[in-house]
């Protein structure tokens, strides 16, 4: 919560327009409350629950991170700016480093765009795009933020197709 407030204040005071915040690195020695092993080791050791379809202990950290992300968005939404809030006027791009932590999968990486981007972003959409390059989300974020980017990525990950479903006309 403290970091969420500090980042929001930095944006509100115009001390920064862009930031990168890493909650925890994939190989950091982060402990999940109630666990004796570090998070990274749990991702490898914990079996996938056959009924749930995921690793419940591993998912606890994801839940805590999402709570922090939600707190950050609330901080942005609480700051009045112009005819709306700071959240209405900015764009936040959040993502995980893997789709399935146990094997460090790069497929189905959860990615989120939040905020109104000054009216350029149509929030509230879930886009499921199996087999698509994750760089499409990055290109979309750049264009929503007003960057003159026509393409992004390299090799097989190169794309010139933003996700237009989330872009206001």
Predicted feature residues:
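Ligand-binding pockets and gating/stacking loops
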Residues: 1-169
């Amino acid at each position: 919560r403290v970091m969420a407030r500090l980042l929001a204040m930095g944006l509100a005071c115009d001390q920064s327009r862009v930031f990168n915040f890493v909650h925890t690195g994939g190989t950091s020695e982060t402990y999940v409350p109630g666990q004796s092993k570090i998070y990274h080791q749990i991702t490898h050791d914990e079996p996938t629950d056959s009924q749930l379809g995921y690793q419940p202990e591993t998912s606890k950290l994801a839940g805590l991170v999402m709570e922090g992300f939600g707190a950050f968005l609330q901080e942005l939404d609480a700051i009045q700016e112009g005819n709306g809030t700071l959240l209405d006027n900015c764009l936040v791009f959040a993502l995980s480093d893997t789709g399935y932590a146990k094997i460090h999968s790069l497929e189905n990486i959860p990615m989120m765009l939040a905020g109104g981007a000054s009216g350029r972003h149509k929030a509230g959409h879930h886009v499921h795009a199996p087999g698509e390059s994750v760089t499409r989300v990055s290109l979309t974020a750049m264009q929503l933020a007003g960057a003159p980017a026509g393409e992004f990525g390299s090799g097989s990950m190169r794309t010139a197709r933003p996700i237009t479903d989330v872009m206001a006309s």
